[in-house]
Every structure is written in structure tokens, then in C-alpha cells.
Regions:
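Secondary-structure end/capping motifs
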Residues: 26-107
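Phosphate-binding core of ATP-grasp and ATP-grasp-like enzymes
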Residues: 10
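A bilobed periplasmic-binding-protein/Venus flytrap-type ligand-binding module shared by bacterial periplasmic
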Residues: 13-30
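Ligand-binding "clamshell"
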Residues: 1-6
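Conserved C-terminal helix/tail region of periplasmic/extracytoplasmic solute-binding proteins
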Residues: 99-142
Length: 142
């Protein structure tokens, strides 16, 4: 049986970049460029579904069109966060779920993520230019 993560009522974060605080502090230009590249990849996948499915099929050795379409619909349409902003509430819920399951998490949610680099893309006009004038919703409604 297959489930959509968002149908399970469990917190999850999608479309994010993970790095350490040293890289954020010492190489912010590299991080900013990588986040811009991630934004371009999100755009490319949405606007070029056949190319995206061909790439996924090649990497995962999937040839069945129905499986590729299903994966594309789930990840490129339903789950992808087009704005790439990490939702603070989702981080807090994820940490709380981990704590309830017995994981020791000492840090506060706000200390675990940084939306500065994504916010810079919006402030600079990068996202608006990339998406041809209209910055998309975080996720498409099913």
C-alpha cells in the first residue's frame, strides 16, 4: 500500500537543503548559489515534465510510463515546495514528534533552519523573474 505523506497527518519538510552551520557562516555565497540552483531545478521540473520523468527513469531504471507519471505527480506536483521556504510550524511539529518518540532534541526549532537564502531570492526578484512574474504557491492543491 502506498500513502502520500501529506495524507498521513505527519509533519515532513520537502524541498530543502541540508548543510552545517560552518558552511552557512563561512561560505554564504556558495549556499546562496546552490539555493538558486535548487530553485531553477524546481522550475525546470515543473515546466518540463517529460524531461524530468526521463531523467528520473534513467537514474532509477524505471521504464513504465505509469510509474514515472505517478512519481512525477507525487513529487513534482503534490509535495514539492515551490517557494522552498521551510515552514517554522512544520519544524516545530517534527521536533515535537521526535521528542514524543523518545528522541532527545535539545535545540529549539528556530535554531535548526534558516530561510534567509530563500528570502534573498524573493527580495532580489530572482524567483519572480524565474517564474515569469508570478511566484508560485508553496504546493499545488491536490
Amino acid at each position: 500500500m502506498i500513502y502520500y505523506l501529506d495524507d498521513l497527518g505527519l509533519p515532513f519538510i520537502y524541498s530543502s537543503l541540508f548543510t552545517n552551520s560552518r558552511t552557512l557562516k563561512n561560505r554564504p555565497i556558495l549556499v546562496q548559489r546552490f539555493v538558486a540552483g535548487l530553485a531553477e531545478a524546481v522550475y525546470l521540473v515543473e515546466k518540463n515534465p517529460q524531461q524530468a520523468m526521463a531523467a528520473v527513469g534513467k537514474i532509477l531504471s524505471i521504464k513504465e510510463p505509469e510509474i514515472l507519471q505517478s512519481a512525477y505527480d507525487a513529487y513534482a506536483k503534490r509535495l514539492i515546495n515551490r517557494r522552498m521556504v521551510v515552514p517554522p510550524k512544520m519544524v516545530a511539529e517534527t521536533i515535537e514528534t521526535a521528542r514524543e518518540e523518545g528522541t532527545s532534541v535539545r535545540r529549539m526549532p528556530a535554531d535548526i533552519f534558516d530561510n534567509t537564502f530563500v528570502e534573498n531570492l524573493e527580495k532580489s526578484g530572482f524567483l519572480k523573474e524565474l517564474w515569469k512574474g508570478e511566484i508560485p504557491e508553496e504546493r499545488k492543491k491536490p
